[in-house]
Amino acid sequence: MGFEETELRLGLPGNGGTEEVLIRKRGFSETETGHEDESATTVDLMLNLSSKEAATTAAAAADPTDKHKTLPKEKTLLPADPAKPPAKTQVVGWPPVRSFRKNMLAVQKSVGEESEKNSSPNASFVKVSMDGAPYLRKVDLKMYKSYRELSDSLGKMFSSFTFGNCESQGMKDFMNESKLNDLLNSSDYVPTYEDKDGDWMLVGDVPWEMFVESCKRLRIMKGKEAIGLGLAPRAMAKCKNRS
């Protein structure tokens, strides 16, 4: 018997023959040869890549104007004229007012203007002040028909004060300087008014219709304070000019 037949080997029974083992196993030389081939291929690929990069770098350094040509073409993919964003709506006011609310306000405004126009020729409101009284009043002169009615109404408004009455014929009494001086020297209050010219005159110096048209404001002052205003000459001159 030979040595090979009696040699102990690790393996399954029946797997005899070294030829099969040699077929399934690679030797050291084959392994080294395979590694050398792979490294050579890798080196070749790296050399090819490095050579391309070197060529590109050299071309860019030689001609700097071609730098834009080597850039990626991502920018060319963008649209040349992008669509503009939609214009924002203009905010007129805040909070917003609905259309029916606007229409209602417009109607109310027009009605108010028409009522003022219609009431203006039929009304003549003037403010009334009195020396010593801490309040003002407003009266419509066209509601009265004479100086007597106006005097009674003013007496009720300022009930805590007393002042001389101006009757419908009071104009003739004011033209008399002696009676005018007696009235001004008394302790009673005298009604005066400011006309369109800005002059202060005594109430009753002109006819009632003319007084209603020219009166802008009424003031009830003490008779002694009305002496220095020089109302009588102006009243007589204006009355003569208007008559």
Curated annotation (Swiss-Prot):
InterPro entries referenced in this protein's UniProt entry, alphabetically: AUX/IAA_dom (IPR033389), AUX_IAA (IPR003311), PB1-like (IPR053793)
Subcellular location, record wording: Nucleus
Region (Disordered): 54-91
Domain called PB1: residue spans: 123-223
Induction entry: By auxin.
Cited Gene3D superfamilies: Phosphatidylinositol 3-kinase Catalytic Subunit, Chain A, domain 1
Keyword Nucleus tagged: yes
A Pfam family this chain is assigned to: AUX_IAA
SUPFAM superfamilies in UniProt: CAD & PB1 domains
Domain of life from the UniProt record: Eukaryota
PROSITE patterns per record: PB1 (PS51745)
Biased composition regions of type Low complexity, renumbered to the chain: 77-89
Quaternary structure (record): Homodimers and heterodimers.
Record's comment describing the protein's domains: The N-terminal half of the protein contains two conserved domains I and II. Domain I includes a slightly degenerated ERF-associated amphiphilic repression (EAR) motif which seems to be involved in the activity of transcriptional repression. Domain II is required for the correct degradation of the protein through the SCF-mediated ubiquitin-proteasome pathway. Interactions between Aux/IAA proteins and auxin response factors (ARFs) occur through their C-terminal dimerization domains III and IV.
Family of the protein in this entry: Belongs to the Aux/IAA family.
Function description: Aux/IAA proteins are short-lived transcriptional factors that function as repressors of early auxin response genes at low auxin concentrations. Repression is thought to result from the interaction with auxin response factors (ARFs), proteins that bind to the auxin-responsive promoter element (AuxRE). Formation of heterodimers with ARF proteins may alter their ability to modulate early auxin response genes expression.
Protein name: Auxin-induced protein AUX28
Organism whose genome encodes this protein: Glycine max
Gene: AUX28
